[in-house]
Amino acid sequence: MWGVSSLDYDDDEELTRLLAVWDDEPLSLFLMNTFLLHQEGFRNLPFTVLRLSYAYRIFAKMLRAHGTPVAEDFMTRVAALARDEGLRDILGQRHAAEASRAEIAEALERVAERCDDRHGGSDDYVWLSRLLDLAPNYRQVELFQLLEKESRGQSRNSVWHLLRMDTVSATKFYEAFVSGCLPGAAAADGSGGGGSHYTGSRAGVSPGIQFGIKHEGLVKTLVECYVMHGREPVRDGLGLLIDPTSGLLGASMDLCFGVLKQGSGRTLLVEPCARVYEIKCRYKYLRKKEDPFVQNVLRRHDAAAVASLLQSHPVPGVEFRGERETPSAREFLLSHDAALFRATLKRARPLKPPEPLREYLADLLYLNKAECSEVIVFDAKHLSDDNSDGDATITINASLGLAAGDAAGGGADHHLRGSPGDSPPPIPFEDENTPELLGRLNVYEVARFSLPAFVNPRHQYYFQMLIQQYVLSQYYIKKHPDPERIDFRDLPTVYLVSAIFREREESELGCELLAGGRVFHCDHIPLLLIVTPVVFDPQFTRHAVSTVLDRWSRDLSRKTNLPIWVPNSANEYVVSSVPRPVSP
């Protein structure tokens, strides 16, 4: 299940023991122990190689402490670089005044053998860092790709938790940018920042988070079959993607399309026009089917019915603001449509946006307000029921046919430029060809339509998706054969998916749920998805990324008394994100 170790990471006590290895030597202590006496040339070592060296050291200590290999593919690749004769020769020539080639080779061999260096061996990691700095850039990117592979499974994987300790993750970027709360520089917790101890048990997790965890798999299938119409996503998900240009920013993504796992190492390859779907399950809208607002959606299935449902909660899921009004940060969807959402005006009192965002907020609102969400309404029924509505039956089979045929067979058209709302043609239904549907609750599409709602750039989710898009774009840029000729339309795009469920009726209790040809044992039935495209301003992304990287490096420099250099490739990102001037 884990792919990195035979240890049972469902055991919080075992995971806590592993994290104690990190706690015994956090990043700041490692840097001071290793480099305070070797500051000559340290300024030229980018944080990317320091991060890779530190990861290798922690994983080696975990092996010695527990006798179990962890992140073996990453460890093997770093050890191979440490034994590379060409890199050793260059290193020996550049630092001949400090040590002989034999001494350097001996130190690197100890690193490759993962020897215990508690007795005066900290110089070994000075040489490893310098050697990694000499390695070609694509080799460094490959090492970060291996860390992503080693952390797949996310919260169920100890490597994922360890890597987040020293990462400004997408979920924590908003606080790092707005308030200067810097996760990972000095302390960390199981969510990636701000605290000193991991709390892995779900006993204290809120009902809303538990609800999202239970239903995320079903929502992913609905997106695959009804939004992407059977195009293949990244199976088994991705781990933590650490920005290969800074070594600091990181993102864990819910659902990706246009990202492949290639070669024997199964490292990721980002294709043109990749898509990221960030999933949010709206627990606060869980209602019974007989609820009048739910019935209104199922009966009318139009924008007005959905708007009424969203406004039925004391904190409406879509906040209305006038064209020139500043939104609050309470909800992640906004609307300027007074006819549908006027009632929310009095419920959320606007505040001044935080200072780092104030100059850019109007432009971000302008870019996103032109976008419209797509709503897909669902219901479920027993296929064995008497049914005079042939259209509903056809709709069921159309979606299942795509999931079973186009998704598995690949289909002829796998480009990702098309609109997520493009619907496939219906497929004729035949009972005798689909016996697996009988006796189960089959999810089918009732209707789809537009909703005048767009993402709120003041909300923390906007910043979470900003970092997801930025990090994935950097992997695409770094692996592109001709980065100077990248078409900005080929960079990854991000969509926000809001999923609303309903409770089961008495006749639906105990029945398996079938969606996209897959069986689910969810307690609830999907009612609707709201799919919202997210637009980013490359100039603002550069400002936000640069602010956080600079703030974090200065903070760590102060703690370690070392000149920490965190590389910043936001300018290259901007160049790739804007249209190129037309040649005369």
UniProtKB/Swiss-Prot annotation:
Could you say which residues are annotated as the site Required for function?
Answer: E216, D254, E278, K280
Q: Where is this region: Disordered?
A: 409-430
A Pfam family matched in the record: Viral_alk_exo
Q: Which class of enzymes does this protein belong to? A: hydrolase
List the record's Gene Ontology CC terms alphabetically.
host cell cytoplasm; host cell nucleus
Alphabetized InterPro entries for the sequence: Herpes_alk_exo (IPR001616), Restrct_endonuc-II-like (IPR011335), Viral_alk_exo (IPR034720)
What domain of life is recorded for the organism? Answer: Viruses
What subcellular locations does the record give? Host nucleus; Host cytoplasm
- The EC number on file is 3.1.-.-
What's in the keyword line of the UniProt record? Endonuclease, Exonuclease, Host cytoplasm, Host nucleus, Host-virus interaction, Hydrolase, Nuclease
Which Gene Ontology molecular function entries are recorded, alphabetically?
DNA binding; endonuclease activity; exonuclease activity
Subunit info here reads: Interacts with major DNA-binding protein; this interaction increases the nuclease processivity of the alkaline exonuclease.
Its annotated function is as follows:
Plays a role in processing non linear or branched viral DNA intermediates in order to promote the production of mature packaged unit-length linear progeny viral DNA molecules. Exhibits endonuclease and exonuclease activities and accepts both double-stranded and single-stranded DNA as substrate. Exonuclease digestion of DNA is in the 5'-> 3' direction and the products are 5'-monophosphate nucleosides. Additionally, forms a recombinase with the major DNA-binding protein, which displays strand exchange activity.
Family recorded in the similarity comment: Belongs to the herpesviridae alkaline nuclease family.
Q: Which named protein is this?
A: Alkaline nuclease
* Taxonomic lineage: Viruses, Duplodnaviria, Heunggongvirae, Peploviricota, Herviviricetes
